[in-house]
């Protein structure tokens, strides 16, 4: 019996999938996994944060000397880091506040700041006297 156990994998949202690898036990007579197995693993479809099963795919034996036992595992997609940095603003005492704006970095997969931040806006600490807020 040839035992194949998929390795657990992780990736950050928006990054490329890691190689899906596995461990093999039960080889006999100097056989190697590369000479006994063909094909590769695949995973459940999805790119959002979550857990996706790693499946046997088309991994198969090319030797009649073994039976294959496969144990799957998971690919976990974790959240990406999104950086939001407020732009520095100034105003003259007594004038209206300027528009508060920000810069965003770390967006992935074609996401936009408006969609990810749900149209969020900035606010400032209350105060009108001369100073830093």
Give residue spans per PLM region.
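Solvent-exposed beta-strand/loop surfaces, strongest in extracytoplasmic domains of secreted
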Residues: 1-133
